[in-house]
Amino acid sequence: IESYIKAKIDGTPIPDSPINPIIQGAVLKFLMWEKQNDIKFVASEKKVYSLKHNVAGICDFLYLNKDGKTCLGDIKTSKGIYKTFYLQLAAYKYMIQEEDPKMQIEDMTIVRVGKDDAELEVKNINDYASNAKAFLACVILHNIMKPIKKY
């Protein structure tokens, strides 16, 4: 599923249509979401890094919404949308804006594509401040736990 979507975002040739009808359905729903929301992809697999916190990640895609505002998105092939995904997107936004303070990210979007049922679920994450705070708390906790030896 992700390889078809990534090819679409990158503008590279889309692989032959998948034989599996579930995957076909998921890809079609993604393409419909893109068209219905007038999405313009501007980057995929964007590497992001925070010098301040020594963390890095790869954002699945950046896009322009119908208002021309820059948004970031992440594709998930899970059974649901979980709170940890919110922190991940907030982390990406935090790192992007640390790298380029002038870059404004309007929305953070999770696109969940079901592996088993061709379901497409799209969730915009509106509470950046709380999720960024939680992400930074996780970084602090990770750094505290790092030197603790296993018993």
Roles of regions detected by a PLM:
Residues 46-151:
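Nucleic-acid nuclease catalytic cores
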Residues 1-56:
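Metal-dependent nuclease catalytic cores that hydrolyze phosphodiester bonds in DNA/RNA
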